[in-house]
Amino acid sequence: MNRAPLIGISRLRMGTDGHGVTTLVAFHDCPLRCKYCLNPQSLTDDAKVMVKTPEVVMQAIRKDELYYLATNGGVTFGGGEPLLRAEFIKELLELGAKQWHITIETSLNVPLQNLVLLFPYIHEYVVDIKDMNPCIYKAYNGRDNELVKSNLRWLIEQGKAENITCRIPLIPEFNTSEDQQSSKQELEAMGITRFDFFKYRTIINNQYDR
């Protein structure tokens, strides 16, 4: 039986995670180790993880189906990195989510096969780009960003450019506003038109708020 570790299911969200009324399903674990992490509980060994089956998660998120249908809302998968759990998400959505708007928040730093598996089910992609400069990206989270770029190019080739929002943060000690603009220009050249710019404000314990 397929199971996945979750850090939370947050219902009745409006205007924060996709279209209309949305339920956020947040997964544990991530391939990155960012210096400032929005959800550090998705990484820690002592996190209060809920291990759930697709059937149990569907029972929870289906409670608000009337709101989804009335507002063109649905479900957003975040984390952590939800694309690490692509098979789980596919099984979950096949239980009955055809009329829901499905959004995924992702770093895209995952194998292409994970992206391909969920491609028929996802309407919107919110991509946490960090920075397009490979040196800045690696200094910030310890990984290369070539996989991010190649996955992004693949989505664009599939005609999804208008369904992608790229998040480009201003990260203290790692990039500048000029770096943000440079990333934006590189992404625009690829065909991306939707961006989310914000600034990290560091607080205690290497967390941040926006």
Regions found by a protein language model. Give the residues of each.
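N-terminal [4Fe-4S]-dependent radical SAM core
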Residues: 1-51, 63-71
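Fold-independent oxyanion-binding glycine-rich loops
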Residues: 9, 27, 40, 54, ...
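Residues at secondary-structure transition points
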Residues: 16, 21, 48, 52, ...
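Short aromatic-enriched loop/helix-cap "lid" or pocket-rim segments at secondary-structure transitions
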Residues: 18-20, 206-210
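Conserved AdoMet/S-adenosylmethionine-binding subsite of the radical SAM
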Residues: 62-66, 71-74, 78-79, 83-208
